[in-house]
Amino acid sequence: MCIRDRWLCAPKGSAFLHVRKDLQNLIHPLTISHGMTTPLGNSTRFRHEFDWTGTRDVSAWCVLPFVIENLTKLVGMNWSEIITHNRNLAIRGRKIICKKLNIVPPCPDYMISSIATIKISSNQVNEIDLYEPDPLHVKLLEDYDIQVPVWSWPNPQGRYIRISAQLYNYEDEYEYLANILEKCL
């Protein structure tokens, strides 16, 4: 899946989902307009279910060539450089947070793209409802205007935070987050 509005600064609604052919029979959309019972012809059930899920506006997809070309001009980097920039920023952000919270990174840097998940220490893991917003997430958002996913998970048990890096992020934002996390945990 590619969320193009986040990673390409494209309009919302331009995301796509790729599924390996051998797994397509296991994946179904949340809403099926008419593809469930349509005769297949030369197509697959996967295509019938996903290709037409109802009324849609394709204009977000139509502007993608413009977005791709103009974002590189705007920042003066090609796409390979943008990807490298975001990856390096995510790695630096993870290091800043891990160092501040005295956490060993859960995986080597080569496994990081532009998103990094960090297991944070918490005495509350067993007390947090999996189906409710994590209190730390709420506190970060309401008290500090920080929007970052925080959740608890039963296996492997722990409380996690996920950071992402994009051209509009800066290292000092990860330092700010690390300082706030240190205060809140």
Predicted regions and their residues:
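Alpha-helical structural signal in soluble globular domains
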Residues: 66, 92, 96, 100, ...
